[in-house]
């Protein structure tokens, strides 16, 4: 078999060099593309598909177009509420516009407690009883504790006067004990 000299001629089986690239428009209209042309075309399409992301250096010169797009869109008036919702609640008892919160309403609710019930609550108050026990033991109380004890005792005296309950002193109890005739109980 005779040897054949290598040629630099482009054939269908040879890969295309960058310098040999032909524009795709030169393909024959109406005729079927050759295998070589189909391969070149598919390679170009693959490059286009493979390319993702931003161009080189676009990080520094990129302009946010997303903000302008959002502003240009028309909002549907049926969607969402027009009333603005505060993210941080600053004033809990702040009235709405046009509404009025009477200042005496809170005081009236506090005063509606039954005096007898309030008296029993004060008498059964554990912290007050503990502070009174400490006073009886001869300990000195702090200013806050002394003020608390004085306020509670004043309120108890006020409620007892309001209900008509009189506190019997120890001297009265001794007198009644001494004056009792024991023969009555036999």
From Swiss-Prot:
Record's compositionally biased regions (Basic and acidic residues): 9-25, 34-45
Keyword Magnesium in record: no
This protein's record includes keyword Zinc: no
Region (Disordered): 1-65
Single annotated GO MF: GTPase activator activity
GO biological process per UniProt: ribosome biogenesis
Top-level taxon of the source organism: Bacteria
Keywords, comma-separated and alphabetical: GTPase activation, Ribosome biogenesis
Cited function: A GTPase-activating protein (GAP) that modifies Der/EngA GTPase function. May play a role in ribosome biogenesis.
Quaternary context: Interacts with Der.
Similarity comment text for this entry: Belongs to the YihI family.
Protein name: Der GTPase-activating protein YihI
The organism of origin for this protein: Histophilus somni (strain 129Pt) (Haemophilus somnus)
Source species taxonomy: Bacteria, Pseudomonadati, Pseudomonadota, Gammaproteobacteria, Pasteurellales
């Amino acid at each position: 078999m005779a040897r054949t000299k290598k040629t630099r001629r482009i054939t269908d089986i040879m890969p295309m060099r960058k310098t040999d690239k032909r524009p795709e428009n030169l393909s024959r209209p109406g005729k079927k593309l050759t295998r070589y042309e189909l391969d070149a075309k598919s390679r170009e399409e693959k490059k286009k598909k493979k390319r993702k992301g931003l161009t080189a250096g676009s990080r520094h010169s990129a302009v946010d177009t997303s903000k302008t797009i959002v502003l240009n869109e028309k909002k549907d008036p049926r969607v969402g509420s027009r009333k603005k919702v505060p993210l941080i609640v600053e004033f809990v008892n702040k009235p709405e516009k046009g509404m009025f919160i009477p200042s005496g309403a809170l005081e009236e609710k506090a005063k509606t407690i039954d005096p007898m019930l309030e008296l029993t609550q004060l008498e059964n108050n554990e912290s007050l009883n503990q502070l009174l026990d400490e006073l009886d033991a001869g300990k000195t109380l702090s200013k806050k504790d002394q003020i608390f004890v004085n306020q509670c005792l004043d309120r108890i005296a006020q409620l007892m006067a309001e209900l008509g309950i009189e506190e019997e002193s120890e001297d009265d109890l001794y007198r009644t004990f001494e004056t009792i005739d024991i023969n009555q109980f036999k």
